[in-house]
Amino acid sequence: MIRSATVLLLLLIAPAYTQPVAVAGFDPHLVTNVYATALAFMVPRTLEPVPVSQLTLWGLHGLTALDPNLITDIKDGKLRLLTHGNLVIERPPLSDTDIDGWAAMASDFAAAAVASSTVVRHAGTQGVVQSFFDELFNHLDPYSRYVAPSDAYEDRERRVGSAGAGLQLVQRGSTILVGSAVSDGPGALAGIRPGDAIISIDGRTVQGKGATAVAQMIAGPEQTTVIVGWRTRDGRVRSAEIERSMVPPETVYAQRAGEMLLVQVTEFNRSTAAHLSRAIEEGLANPHPPEGIVLDLRGNRGGLVRQAVEAADMLLPAGVVAITAGRDPEASRIWRSARGELAGTIPVVVLVDGRTASAAEILAAALADRGRGVVLGSSTLGKGLVQTISPLPDGGELFITWSRVLAPRGWPIQGLGVLPQVCASLGPESLVRQLAELAEGRDPMAPAVTAERALRAPLAPAQVLAIRNACPAAEGRDSDLEAARALIHDPATYAAALLPPLRDRSETTSVVSSPSLISAPKDH
């Protein structure tokens, strides 16, 4: 929750401290650029408007977090930094339109703190920047954050991939094995399969090297080539020249489980929807097609919202998938399905648990609200806020929450989460009773599910707790799959758990109050 504060922007007095002291290990120019880029990105996009002066003052409290002897305050219309009660630097506040000026001032204060404090000096440039954002984001929502350069690189790899062969390597003793291969990655297309052993890269043996080192040998600039030698599981030695490409990690794992097609989606990166579509198409093309699809979203923490919308698109007829609302025009939109139903009317059961979050909740809520799937498991995490990302000059990234998500029936996902139609977290006996009642046409979860769908933001904590207590969040269990099998095997039980479908636009547009939301989604 954003806390208000008053900032005096009155006096135009020459600064008492005009030039930051150059200190080894601290780069004031980089810090200025990072702050300026971040503040310019945040000011028009935060969920609630916050002036740049307030954002900067919050961030400067990071100096106190590093060294409690450093205090930032406002006195006589001037912003001051003190140590042990002694003035270190003071400046007149600036106009809230001067974002670059506030960034430069914050950098000057940081440089003065570095010169005055051994603790801050030891933290260095990265420590000062990290502390600035840590303190700033303490005043915003739980999901807005700064990601340092080292972690940002890993985050980007998860979202968009890295240039390589699309292979995940593992070490078994002295052997480097392929743990998994992205199905449409260059390695898999060259014939490399899980379980094969990598033996050479560009003619150099990998003997004595670990999996990470071998992965680094395979990686390189996009559209360059690497020669990979490997030994297949049946002992044949093969070699191929592979062109490196950007390959996101695999997120979709499909297998036949009796009469069901079980599809696990671990997160949503830029290839998830395409891989999910292929998995469903291949599963349905089997000479003995499955009786139903089980979409396993347990433990899925989310990812790219557009990918979740595209995943919903392949299972839903035309209509609303989700509604997002924010201050930036690009943040407010109605996300729609349009492509048609890839799986026809085949039953769909969606497995969720207390770790299912964000984009995964959007997909689960859409399938449930539109009467296309039965959600089974426990209450999900309840992360109904969407972040937009900006790269920063230090190589880090800024994640800013810029919109709230509403499900197709108009209820907010944030805080509530998705309440399943079949609750598996109340124990095995309760689950058996629910399935038996559904088989007789009675839906024991209907009152709670209906109550959730009727809620509108903002919500009181008591409302949230009352809904979530109907099916407390928990980790998924093996019995979830057996319950899904029971739903798919008995059409009457499955039908009793379904919500009635939203049949036309009028049933969803009533939840939208802002004209800016009535627009088709645009690509990022």
Q: What do the PLM-derived regions correspond to, one by one?
A:
Residues 11-147, 290, 448-524:
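Terminal targeting/pro-maturation regions of precursor/exported proteins
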Residues 40-45, 113, 187-210, 293-296:
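Conserved PDZ fold ligand-binding element
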Residues 131-133, 138-180:
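PDZ/PDZ-like peptide-tail recognition elements
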Residues 139-140, 174-177, 199, 213-253, ...:
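PDZ-domain C-terminal substructure recognizer with occasional recognition of PDZ-binding tails
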Residues 186-197, 219-221, 288, 366:
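A short glycine-leucine-enriched loop at secondary-structure breakpoints
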